[in-house]
Amino acid sequence: ATAWSYGVDETMTFLIPNWEGGASGYNVGEKSQLCETMKDNGVPKRSAEQFCQQVPTYRGEKAFTSGPVYMGAIICFLFVLGLLIVPGPYKWALLVATLFSVALAWGRNMMWLTELFFNYFPMYNKFRAVESILVVAEITMPLLGILALQQIVDKKIAWEKLRMNMFIAGGITAGLCLFFALFASVVDVTSSYDAQWVNQVPAWLRDAIFDERTAMIKADAWRSFIFIALGFAVVYWYAWKSNTQPLASSPYRLIAFYGALAVLVLADMLPVNKRFFGNDHFVKAKDADAYFAMQPYEQQILQDESYYRVLNLATNTFNDARTSYRLKSIGGYSAAKLRRYQDLIDEHISKEMNPLMQTVMRTQGFMLPDENEGKDFPVLNMLNMKYAVVPLQGGKQAPVQNPYAMGNCWFVDEVILVDTPDEECALLSEIDLHKQAVADKKFAEALDITKPEVTPLMAFDESSIELTSYAPNCLQYESMNERNQVAVFSEIYYPYDWHLYIVNNNGEKMELPLARVNYTLRAAVIPAGHHQLVMEFQPHAIQTDKWCMAILILALLLSVGGLTYPLWRKKK
């Protein structure tokens, strides 16, 4: 959650948008100082212009970013003015809310406050990025600026005092901008993330990129200074006119005042917004449809009507969502990805992709069910990867069937208990996942391992368990086993609202406790016999919300009826 913490000095982007370098891959333009330097050093024009479309100008401490939080130069000026002239508790409430928002957005840079909110304030730990709390400041700062304008329009402050406070607010905001416009070189424009690329380019290009960062600060500092000066002039003009000529064309003056400010704010904000969310980010409907058009490899895979998963090696596996459009993907991207699944990607899946590709190349896409081959990517087999999509020449893709996929569920002979999650994760590449499972010792009771009355776990040729029906929120299985056995389900374990039942012929349900094995998967002890199993997702929060909504609607109807009935009786 703290990976996207807003830097303390990065807060200057409220006032100077490109203070921190804009975005991770920023388009500095063909007319930039960097582009000219590259051409002067013999780089072909086209290559220089292409490079300048994706320059590592961002110098903050986030892994990457698509743009800064820019409040607006005029908004910052009005906010500071509001702190000086707005009386009463509203000012202090808005100031405290703004400061809290900024402090929480700092995340790991103010860890004691972040940990306090993360651990003790409900729902706060659901935020993916702590900097998203800056939406509060994006409301409170303009709101205090509006209250400042109200003070000026309503003439609730003496002209001399107002003029002095206007110069103070303008001096603080415009003064900061002017200082960095004149002395931008005093800012350290290096970053700890520069090590990822700085040794891969010549020294002159490295220095040119650093100079471009400085130039970006200087240009935007001048820009903000000019907008503050213009905003100051408009506010000063209106306040001066209202005090020296209070009755002359007052309504038209007010319209001109608000109109001029609105135009200036839009002129300030819109160009900055378009830097990071411009016309290039919009896609035509026909282009979007073409992106999701059925591919030959998808047609081939979809002929298989069994239940399986696919790993797409022909794309950016863990940052691509297209594969999941038609296929059940092991990869893909989600902002709400479970941490344990990300661990599985980092520690196993990403490391098994290269051996998988080597096996595909060695077998020329025809993998035979040889036990020794499948041992190179056991976790992918555990996740029921029946197909791998591999790249071909000419930008095409082809599916390769994996005969080592372990299926949707299976019985194991032994469950190994460990003390820590690290041990559990590490053992996945060491044990035989077909016959063994590894679990945290806190699940020992749920797996019935510690209960002496349970028959020792053994595997029989007669034992079988298979998935018979699939839906995202309901999976049905059929099991046949002569003794109590641990079944491992190739489904990601989630501790809330998932329930496993044995369904008898008369429809009665008996719940079985679910446990976590193999770091991420679900497991349960299946009693001896022939059973129909149902695994259902039953979110209690949604059910509770439905009842609450029904009660509220009923209460609303009764209230409306109680209010209208006397009127109806009186009219009758």
PLM features: residue spans?
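Extracytoplasmic/lumenal acceptor-recognition loop(s) of multi-pass membrane glycoenzymes
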Residues: 7, 19-24, 261-292, 296-380, ...
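Soluble non-transmembrane domains of integral membrane proteins
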Residues: 1-56, 391, 402-468, 474, ...
